[in-house]
Amino acid sequence: MSDILPLDVIGRRVEVNGEYATVRFCGAVPPVAGLWLGVEWDNPERGKHDGSHEGTMYFKCRHPTGGSFVRPSKVNFGDDFLTALKKRYVLEDGPDDDENSCSLKVGSKQVQTIGFEHITKKQSQLRALQDISLWNCAVSHAGEQGRIAEACPNIRVVNLSKNLLSTWDEVVLIAEQLKDLEALDLSENKLQFPSDSPTLTRTFSTLKTLVLNKTGITWTEVLHCAPSWPVLEELYLKSNNISISERPVNVLQKMRLLDLSSNPSIDESQLSLIADLPRLEHLVLSDIGLSSIHFPDAEIGCKTSMFPALKYLIVNDNQISEWSFINELDKLQSLQALSCTRNPLSKADKAEEIIIAKIAQLRTLNRCQILPEERRGAELDYRKAFGNEWRKAGGHPDPDKNRPNAAFLSAHPRYQLLCCKYGAPEDEELKTQQPFMLKKQLLTLKIKCSNQPERQILEKQLPDSMTVQKVKGLLSRLLKVPVSELLLSYESSKMPGREIELENDLQPLQFYSVENGDCLLVRW
């Protein structure tokens, strides 16, 4: 806190009693004597008015209770970069130590060191820093030119989130002294960005990661600044109310990751404007209200030219409720991983299995690896579940008669491919099971490992409608043996010594007349 005001006080970011604000006015507010600062709070509930007092408008606020008048002595205008860095990282003299003793401060931790020369130790400590965090340290400006470069020339990673930086120009003054800067986090600094492209310099020539969450930046401002980021690979723009208004032409061409989450103004049509980024592998679109997506350049069963390198897509917390969304994702030529949690579609029965069946090349779903046997099971279940619908739409096991209508092919683009892969569903598979009491469905079965007689015989209750494939999945988890290696048969309690193979993975236990008290025989 200081009674001396900065020359450029209007627009400065400040902190007052732990709350953040922007200075909008400096001057007298009659009839009360003295100098006042009019501030607009980040939290509008903190304020008292809209910038007016007794009928006179001194400044404007976006919210009717977003403004207050405060005395300059109550306002924290922050520290320069190096002062904040020393407060957090460097040696401080201990009040009771002798002249050869000092205490090392890292965050809030104090570590005593004996016998080191203070100044030399301080300088060497700063020069050794490469990865620093000045989160919430009230950094407001660069300070005297050249001092950062002299004191800490080896810094590569800087977290400056939640500070008092007011303008992009001030960020440039800091960054131009860090010649090896690779990653910079400026989140939660309400920054004023240049309205047109700044003069090209080498300030950010090594920058690969830039985090601008909650900075108030617009897409136009991103594109204005982007020529200064020639090797940028990761850009985070969460919670800025961004709308994508134009294509990034000759900029951001090396970007691999783009986070646009929590920007509700973004819609499906805007995504086409970034679809030509040649190296974009990772796209985060969580919490933007997304409900649909289309790649109009690709027909059913074909691949789109849009997002050619996209491998990882995150669309959590959206309004996705139609399977057509998932169908479209199968058109992406490079997609390997999808996260689609907390969407209306996620609540559908067997939603994850259906997603796996619909997207052929998917390797990871909701951060879980898709094993080959899991994919096979999902595709077989999908083929069976929609078999009757396929038949009604004109599908047929005979290739010469197999002509499902356009509506079915649109809703199930991969169904024909699955029939080619596994064969068309047989009549027996498509018969509807008649419902009956659950108690009658449950079978108490012994499970014996035939080639490992020393293993304890297990006992499990299984529904007789459970398919052989799902029984194998259960046994795979119990025995820690891959599904593909398991062979199943059973021995009837009514016919001791006779072994019956369970050779069709798609058939339920009841198909083989497995009964209560029978013994499943497992080999691998």
From Swiss-Prot:
Positions of modified residues (N6-acetyllysine): 460
Tissue specificity of this protein: Ubiquitously expressed.
Database matches in CDD domains: Ubl_TBCE (cd17044)
Subcellular location: Cytoplasm; Cytoplasm, Cytoskeleton
LRR repeat ranges per the UniProt record: 154-175, 180-201, 206-227, 231-253, 254-275, 279-300, 309-330
Domain of life of the organism encoding this protein: Eukaryota
Chain's role: Tubulin-folding protein; involved in the second step of the tubulin folding pathway and in the regulation of tubulin heterodimer dissociation. Required for correct organization of microtubule cytoskeleton and mitotic splindle, and maintenance of the neuronal microtubule network.
Protein name (database record): Tubulin-specific chaperone E
Organism expressing this protein natively: Mus musculus (Mouse)
Top-level taxonomy: Eukaryota, Metazoa, Chordata, Craniata, Vertebrata
